[in-house]
A protein has these predicted regions:
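N-terminal non-catalytic cap/leader segment that marks the start of a structured domain
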Residues: 1-98, 195, 280-295
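Catalytic-pocket segment enriched in acidic/His residues
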Residues: 7, 46-53, 60-62, 67-68, ...
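Residues embedded in well-ordered beta-strands
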Residues: 11, 134-138, 159, 203
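Residue-level recognition of short, solvent-exposed, well-ordered loop/turn junctions
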Residues: 74, 81, 114, 130, ...
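Structural signature of FAD isoalloxazine-binding scaffolds in flavoprotein oxidoreductases
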Residues: 97-115, 131, 260-265
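Active-site glycine-rich loop that binds ribose-phosphate moieties when present
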Residues: 104, 112-125, 138-146
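N-terminal accessory regions of nucleic-acid-interacting proteins
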Residues: 144-158
C-alpha cells in the first residue's frame, strides 16, 4: 500500500497514477493542529487497514496530477539521521569515523517539506549547499531497546528523503535543519511493498545529471542495527523518521536546479530549487571551501 498526505492534510491511497481519498475512514481531521493525522493512521494501522483498503476501492479516483502531495508525516516526534553510513561517501568526505561509532544526530521537524514544495537555499556567501540522497524509514510501533532481530517489526514503511546540507564545520544539526532541508515523499510505501530491505536501490539526479546511485546493501550500519542503536538511547514512536545516510556523489545545488530522487518500489519525486529570503546569519559568517577527497 502507498499512503499519501495531500491537499491540506487529507489521507489518500495511491494506486498507479490515481489517488483515493480515505480521510474520513482514517478518522483524520485535516484541520487538526498539530497536524498529526498520519501519525494516528500509522499508530492504528493494524485496526484500520481493512477499512482503508475497502474505502480505496469505493472512493472516487483523483489523478495525482490534480492534487498537491505533501510530506507524509508532517509532525513526527523526531527525525533521526545517520552520518557517513556508506563507505564511498565516507571516503569522499575524508571522514575518519563512521555511523557505527558516531551514532545518530537529530534534524528539526520544521525542516520537513513535501514533493510539491521547493527547496529554499539561504543566501550564504562562501558556502556550498549540497544534496544527499537517502531513504526514510517510517517507524510503525513504539519501542525501546529493540534488538536488531526484531527491528523490522517496528518498520511501518519507507519513503524518499533528501538531506540538504550546508557544508562547513558548524554544528551539524543547524547546517541540516533550515526550513525545507528535509524533503520526504512522495508517499509512504508500506513495508510489505519492499521485497528485500537489505537491497533497496536509490538514485538522484540534478537536472539531467545522475549524481548518486546506491543500494542499502552498501550500508555500514544496516537498517536493523540503525533501529537497535537509535532505540538504545531513545524510545521510538509511530511516525518517527530515520534517515539512512547518503552514498557518494553529494554536490552543490543552485537556484534554478531541479532535484529528482527515486527509490525502487517506493516512488520518485522532483523538487525545484529556489533562493530563500536573505537573512543575515552570524553563525555562517566565515567562508568554507568544500574539498572532495581524491583517490
Amino acid at each position: 500500500m502507498r499512503i499519501a498526505r495531500f491537499n491540506g492534510g487529507r489521507i489518500g491511497i495511491v494506486v498507479g497514477d490515481m489517488l483515493h481519498d480515505v480521510t474520513a475512514v482514517a478518522g483524520v481531521d485535516p484541520a487538526e493542529w498539530p497536524p498529526v493525522g498520519m501519525v494516528r493512521v500509522i499508530a492504528r494501522f493494524t485496526q484500520l487497514k481493512d477499512a482503508l483498503v475497502a474505502a480505496a476501492r469505493s472512493a472516487p479516483a483523483l489523478s495525482l496530477a490534480d492534487v498537491r502531495l505533501e510530506t507524509p508525516v508532517a509532525w513526527p516526534n523526531k527525525i533521526i539521521a545517520y552520518p557517513t553510513d556508506y563507505r564511498d561517501h565516507a571516503a569522499e568526505m575524508s571522514a575518519s569515523t563512521h555511523a557505527d561509532v558516531q551514532g545518530y544526530f537529530l534534524k528539526a521537524s520544521s525542516s520537513l517539506c513535501g514533493p510539491s514544495d521547493a527547496i529554499e537555499l539561504p543566501d550564504i556567501p562562501g558556502r556550498e549547499i549540497h544534496h544527499e540522497c537517502e531513504i526514510a524509514l517510517v517507524i510503525g510501533k513504539q519501542g525501546r531497546h529493540i534488538a536488531a532481530a526484531r527491528a523490522f517489526d517496528h518498520v511501518f514503511g519507507y519513503a524518499c528523503l533528501l538531506d540538504i546540507t550546508i557544508r562547513g564545520k558548524e554544528e551539524r544539526v543547524m547546517r541540516k535543519s533550515f526550513d525545507t532541508f528535509t524533503p520526504v515523499g512522495p508517499w509512504i510505501a508500506t513495508a510489505d511493498e519492499i521485497p528485500d530491505p537489505a537491497d533497496i536501490k536509490m538514485r538522484l539526479w540534478v537536472n539531467a545529471e545522475k549524481r548518486q546511485e546506491a543500494s542499502t546493501r552498501d550500508l555500514i550500519v544496516n537498517i536493523p542495527h540503525m533501529i537497535e542503536i537509535a532505540s538504545s538511547a531513545s524510545t521510538l514512536y509511530p511516525g518517527d523518521l530515520i534517515a539512512t545516510g547518503t552514498p557518494a556523489g553529494v554536490g552543490p545545488l543552485r537556484a534554478g536546479d531541479t532535484v529528482t530522487i527515486e527509490v525502487d518500489n517506493v516512488g520518485r519525486m522532483t523538487l525545484p530549487v529556489i533562493t530563500a529570503k536573505a537573512v543575515a546569519n552570524p553563525v555562517f559568517g566565515s567562508p568554507y571551501e568544500f574539498k572532495r577527497a581524491t583517490t
